[in-house]
């Protein structure tokens, strides 16, 4: 549900005029996929960009829908194509292996395969496709650079910067670096090919996220590191850094009486972060656009703050100006 002016969440027929579709979807609504084996195929993951969406299935690959002005849906750009009220759902192919993760950036798409390879398509003006140029790419193309031959276990993007984590815990980045996201390897504001980031001091990385102007990683010990520009989580005095700085574990509830607390999962929106602990608690910080942090105020939050919820938080997702949590009730 949500904004649908580019059919980014499918075609939903109007009840008043059956020839038209809704531009706003106000309640959860099913999206029929063009499946060959609907009884066997399940949706594994969905990712949403500015105006396009990717759907990963277990047996029939990846589907895309919405705006394809830059090739972000993995198909040829058609001049003058009208995306409003479009019923087109495209099956993306051209992969050498099964896709196991899909991630939408603002106007680009990333795909990770079972072999640990990364493919990209879409808008590339900041190098966010990682294909060695700054043009658009209409079809998924495999990335090389420093990730060539490396087993990538996770990819992350949100705006125009991209990060990738290897099975050995190394971090790679490409795309926009206007806000110091990739300043550890270059003074350029754009990087068009994956580069290894020399963040040895953070330990073995298990997860990375990147927002509009900042980034963060979580290591295997449950410690969280942040860098870039904006509200990073270490108070109002740290608004810019090109090297990762650890957010004190005590801000997530670690103490001598509770030493086993660890951050287990990390999420991000355009300007805010969310962290889940192994105790089922949710902490948030960053720009509090329209109250998206859920902390009872619309003030920005400069360090992690625990969100009060009646249960254990199982998962969380962050949008541009909203946050959704999946909670298991105490009762």
Listing of model-derived features with the role each one plays in the protein:
Residues 1-331:
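Eukaryote-biased RCC1-like beta-propeller repeat architecture
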């Amino acid at each position: 549900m949500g904004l649908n002016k580019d059919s980014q969440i499918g075609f939903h027929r109007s009840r008043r005029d059956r020839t038209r579709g809704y531009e706003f979807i106000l309640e959860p609504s099913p999206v029929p996929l063009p499946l060959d084996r609907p009884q066997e195929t399940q949706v594994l993951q969905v990712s949403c960009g500015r105006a396009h969406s990717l759907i990963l299935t277990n047996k029939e690959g990846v589907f895309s829908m919405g705006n394809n002005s830059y090739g972000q849906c993995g198909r040829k750009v058609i001049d003058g194509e009208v995306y409003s009220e479009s019923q087109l759902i495209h099956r993306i192919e051209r992969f050498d292996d099964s896709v196991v993760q899909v991630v939408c950036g603002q106007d680009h798409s990333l795909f990770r395969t079972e072999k640990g390879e990364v493919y990209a398509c879409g808008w590339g003006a900041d190098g966010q496709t990682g294909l060695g140029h700054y043009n658009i790419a209409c079809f998924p193309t495999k990335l090389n650079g420093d990730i060539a031959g490396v087993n990538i276990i996770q990819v992350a993007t949100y705006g125009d910067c991209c990060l990738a984590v290897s099975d050995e815990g190394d971090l790679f980045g490409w795309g926009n670096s206007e806000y110091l996201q990739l300043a550890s390897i270059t003074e350029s504001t754009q990087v068009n090919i994956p580069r290894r980031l020399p963040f040895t001091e953070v330990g073995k990385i298990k997860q990375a996220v990147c927002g509009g102007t900042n980034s963060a990683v979580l290591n295997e010990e449950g410690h969280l590191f942040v860098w870039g520009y904006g509200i990073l989580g270490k108070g109002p005095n740290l608004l810019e850094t090109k090297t990762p700085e650890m957010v004190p574990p005590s801000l997530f509830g670690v103490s001598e009486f509770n030493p086993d607390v660890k951050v287990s999962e990390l999420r991000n929106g355009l300007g805010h972060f969310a962290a889940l602990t192994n105790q089922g608690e949710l902490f948030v910080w960053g720009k509090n656009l329209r109250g998206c942090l859920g902390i009872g105020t619309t003030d920005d939050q400069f360090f992690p703050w625990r969100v009060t919820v009646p249960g254990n938080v199982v998962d969380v997702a962050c949008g541009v100006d909203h946050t959704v949590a999946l909670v298991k009730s105490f009762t």
